[in-house]
Amino acid sequence: MAQEGGAVEQFGQWLWSNPIEQDPDDEMVDAREEEGQILYLDQQAGLRYSYSQSTTLKPTPPGQSNSAPVYRNAQRFQTEYLSPTTVTRSQVSVLSLSHTRPQLRPALSLLNSTPRANNQPWVATLIPSQSAGPPQRSSEPKRLTGRNSRNQR
């Protein structure tokens, strides 16, 4: 039984840490990555989130120069809530193909749509950063402000 719990924990760590893989033949068009955290000091709890989105252009197949472009859009949104008694993790990954170039989406819109307990109102405001190139890992979380949060740097 203890070994089964360890395997579940290892799978959870792998799932949390591995990014969505890109096709090496695709050309990077757009990318965005955002990270942040909120501390609820009165509850000794915290929420962290990570969001990445990338859009690539698939190469035109040989002999089909008149075909419409095909965009591959990959999105990954993760949240983790930690308190002395609770650990909750959530992850959503979306992969889509389209003939129109998708818009980059801010993480805040996803974070605001994440269900919360009645006693956990959303009071933080995200100050996002955008990247024009491929997603890069940031060692610093973005700054958040709000009544129940503390600025992080």
Curated annotation (Swiss-Prot):
Q: Where is this region: Disordered?
A: 1-24, 121-153
User: Which segments show compositional bias classed as Polar residues?
Assistant: 121-138
Provide a GO biological process annotation.
transport of virus in host, cell to cell
- Pfam family for this entry, one: Luteo_Vpg
Please provide the record's keywords in A-Z order.
Transport, Viral movement protein
Protein family according to the UniProt entry: Belongs to the luteoviruses movement protein family.
Role summary: Transports viral genome to neighboring plant cells directly through plasmosdesmata, without any budding. The movement protein allows efficient cell to cell propagation, by bypassing the host cell wall barrier.
* Protein known as: Movement protein
